[in-house]
């Protein structure tokens, strides 16, 4: 049970609807804050209620426009720190810059680590994120980070559709996603398949080979994010050509950079299951897309954090 007198929750502009749902699930009122832009683009934030001595949560996905939303979050944290908040906990449903988690070429930055440093220096006491692109990002922080998962929601959704057992196969779009695919396959009591993908250029992918059996089965792709949708749609075509009965896809983060929607609309995919970790504009809400809300996941995390209980037990 959350101590409502000691806890406050606020939202930036990136995903206000999700923040409202999280607050409602947690039994909290969304805090009042004025967020404006000066004519030159600078961010101005004023907290319009007292936060002195309170445990404060701020909901903000660092999605497109990434730099705007990140800077807004940092300024929000600074305002809370200067207003004497007891603890500042940031809920980042989608953690931008997560794909820049290592040096693959000489003289490249590791921007995921830079963002972690910026958040910590700004005054964040705890980060609550969901399905980070790379697990090692958790180690970039010198403050507690709770890593939420959307996979149980997706498993429940597909189970309710009757998708389980030998008639289903979970497909990883690349070798790096095998661990994620195996977890979903365990929950659906089915086998996995793996696509061997070669990427000649950024945001371009080419399907080369398939490991596993898909003929006559319902195939479910799973990934942490879909960006331009080239990987998923090329993979879906390859699976369909090899005799899959139906092809579905699911991901936590619907980045959906152009031309993702066009590709998904034209693809053989029957349904794309996503979460609301990123606010999806109305123009991108096509009939094929099913949105699952992660509001209860973060509301439960708030409850456990404020009561000094284990957050990881939510996923055991």
Curated annotation (Swiss-Prot):
What phylogenetic lineage does the species belong to?
Answer: Bacteria, Fusobacteriati, Fusobacteriota, Fusobacteriia, Fusobacteriales
Q: Which organism is it from?
A: Fusobacterium nucleatum subsp. nucleatum (strain ATCC 25586 / DSM 15643 / BCRC 10681 / CIP 101130 / JCM 8532 / KCTC 2640 / LMG 13131 / VPI 4355)
| One GO cellular component term noted in the UniProt record for this chain | ribose phosphate diphosphokinase complex
Query: Which sites bind D-ribose 5-phosphate?
Result: 199, 223, 227-231
- Protein name (database record): Ribose-phosphate pyrophosphokinase
Q: What does this protein do?
A: Involved in the biosynthesis of the central metabolite phospho-alpha-D-ribosyl-1-pyrophosphate (PRPP) via the transfer of pyrophosphoryl group from ATP to 1-hydroxyl of ribose-5-phosphate (Rib-5-P).
Instruction: Give the primary localization class.
Output: cytoplasm
Q: Mind telling me which SMART domains this protein's record contains?
A: Pribosyltran_N (SM01400)
Keyword list (alphabetical) reads: ATP-binding, Cytoplasm, Kinase, Magnesium, Metal-binding, Nucleotide biosynthesis, Nucleotide-binding, Transferase
């Amino acid at each position: 049970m959350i101590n409502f007198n000691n806890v406050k929750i606020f939202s930036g502009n990136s995903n206000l609807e999700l923040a409202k749902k999280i607050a409602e699930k947690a039994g909290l009122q969304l805090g009042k804050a004025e967020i404006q832009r000066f004519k030159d683009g600078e961010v101005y934030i004023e907290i319009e209620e007292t936060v002195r001595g309170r445990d404060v949560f701020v909901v903000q996905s660092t999605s497109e426009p990434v730099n705007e939303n990140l800077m807004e979050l940092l300024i929000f944290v600074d305002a809370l720190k200067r207003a004497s908040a007891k603890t500042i906990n940031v809920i980042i449903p989608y953690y931008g810059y997560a794909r820049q988690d290592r040096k693959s070429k000489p003289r490249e930055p590791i921007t995921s680590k830079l963002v972690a440093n910026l958040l910590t220096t700004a005054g964040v006491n705890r980060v609550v994120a969901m399905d980070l692109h790379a697990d090692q990002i958790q180690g970039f922080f010198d403050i507690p980070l709770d890593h939420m998962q959307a996979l149980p929601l997706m498993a429940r959704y597909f189970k309710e559709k009757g998708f389980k057992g030998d008639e289903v196969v979970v497909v990883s779009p690349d070798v790096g996603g095998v661990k994620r695919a195996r977890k979903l396959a365990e929950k659906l009591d089915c086998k996995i398949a793996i696509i061997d993908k070669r990427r000649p250029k950024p945001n371009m992918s080419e399907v080369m080979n398939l490991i596993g059996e898909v003929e006559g089965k319902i195939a479910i792709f799973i990934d942490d994010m879909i960006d331009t949708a080239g990987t998923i749609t090329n993979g879906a075509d390859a699976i369909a050509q090899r005799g899959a009965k139906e092809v579905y896809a699911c991901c936590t983060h619907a980045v959906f950079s152009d031309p993702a929607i066009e590709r998904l609309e034209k693809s053989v995919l029957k349904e794309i299951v996503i979460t609301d970790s990123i606010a999806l504009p109305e123009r991108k809400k096509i009939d094929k897309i099913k949105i699952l809300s992660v509001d209860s996941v973060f509301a439960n995390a708030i409850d456990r954090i404020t009561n000094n209980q284990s957050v990881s037990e939510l996923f055991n």
